[in-house]
Amino acid sequence: MAIREIKDVERGEIVNKVEDLGKPFLTHEDDEKESENNESYLMVLFSTFVAVCGSFEFGSCVGYSAPTQSSIRQDLNLSLAEFSMFGSILTIGAMLGAVMSGKISDFSGRKGAMRTSACFCITGWLAVFFTKGALLLDVGRFFTGYGIGVFSYVVPVYIAEISPKNLRGGLTTLNQLMIVIGSSVSFLIGSLISWKTLALTGLAPCIVLLFGLCFIPESPRWLAKAGHEKEFRVALQKLRGKDADITNEADGIQVSIQALEILPKARIQDLVSKKYGRSVIIGVSLMVFQQFVGINGIGFYASETFVKAGFTSGKLGTIAIACVQVPITVLGTILIDKSGRRPLIMISAGGIFLGCILTGTSFLLKGQSLLLEWVPSLAVGGVLIYVAAFSIGMGPVPWVIMSEIFPINVKGIAGSLVVLVNWSGAWAVSYTFNFLMSWSSPGTFYLYSAFAAATIIFVAKMVPETKGKTLEEIQACIRRET
């Protein structure tokens, strides 16, 4: 039996086309009031807090190697190649986790996927803590990478699926913010404690997450899709408050899921067709540029970079990075829906270009024994400008654009491709960074600056402005320019 009417889950309205499901799932319309004055969002807020413990864990894993490089290499007598493998194998695990995350969360639920992630991360941190050589160290790092690869998918999906319309936009931004906070905390406390103790602190968000999962509901949308009718309504009622009328929303979710099931399933070869080719080029290219401006190399090895620039210790620099990242990320969250995507990412790339030039010049001056008193200041200033610029645009905006340029029927497979490209680039950059620095420290940062300049040109020529447009309008714009 064909579905002729589809209820808008967020507004309780009826629409007449399956195509209306193509509208962006995450919106920022705040002008409508809730119909139920006694509606409670305490469980939504608590559930979000539990979920973003996974985001915090993500940041902790990414930020671990920067303040610990010197001490790990010294204590375990690791070569440059061995530590480079330790730093980069995180992304190999994350690639595998990201590719499998969709199937895991569809099979075991969003909560089940988060449990799986937490268990992998706990196992990984314990392996790092008990290691006495490179092998167990790499195994532990791989396990934490797999865990955060799954987290990178399931946390924002879970938050989006449990949140009411008027809170969804704000709550979903907490994912990126908590990643930054997690990495910043690793930078800060990693400068004060041993690398083994820092590994143990990585257990804390996982333990909080596992404990919290016992008290929060499963995603109502997943329960409905899995056919758990009774559990679906219980979970939705728990999220909306015991006195809230969930009839319209529950019916809308069920009808919406039925409508989605009649859409054609996407195939990998569809992504190279003319219909989707431009969107794929935009999504993949932005992820390539995001990684090849060098963020994971600079982030993973910040401490060692400052030492090479002339500091007796890299701790001051990593602390400064931590202090810059959080407020700038908050600012970027505020600006993204006001300034637009294109201006923000181009300004960000311009700042990255400047930061790379300053940092590269500091190493050039040091190598030529010129203006040595200026070298540390130039290095710190350049890296801080780089980090601030990346945090405000190049970090979050490519993910936002990726979520907007693909229609719903190919979003899953296209998103998997884009995530795989992102983690592949992260691995390549983190693995080659130390080798590039050994080859030429100035050349490394000048190379990254070239990618930043190329980003500006690419965005100006290829990327449409998506602010304030529906998904259909964005796709129409892309087709007109094809």
From Swiss-Prot:
Protein family per UniProt: Belongs to the major facilitator superfamily. Sugar transporter (TC 2.A.1.1) family.
Spans through the membrane? 42-62, 80-100, 117-137, 142-162, 173-193, 197-217, 280-300, 316-336, 344-364, 382-402, 413-433, 443-463
| GO cellular component entries | membrane
**Organism superkingdom:** Eukaryota
* Role noted for this protein: Sugar transporter.
> Which Pfam family is one of this chain's hits?
Sugar_tr
Kindly provide the name given to this protein in its UniProt entry: Sugar transporter ERD6-like 16
- Name the membrane topology term: Multi-pass membrane protein
Gene Ontology MF, one: sugar transmembrane transporter activity
Sorted keywords for this record are: Membrane, Sugar transport, Transmembrane, Transmembrane helix, Transport
SUPFAM superfamilies in the cross-refs: MFS general substrate transporter
The cross-references to PANTHER family, in alphabetical order and at most eight, read:
PTHR48021, SUGAR TRANSPORTER ERD6-LIKE 16
Supply the InterPro entries for this chain: MFS_dom (IPR020846), MFS_ERD6/Tret1-like (IPR044775), MFS_sugar_transport-like (IPR005828), MFS_trans_sf (IPR036259), MFS_Trehalose_Transporter (IPR050549), Sugar/inositol_transpt (IPR003663)
Q: What is the species listed in this Swiss-Prot or TrEMBL entry? A: Arabidopsis thaliana
Q: From the Swiss-Prot or TrEMBL record, state where the protein is found.
A: Membrane
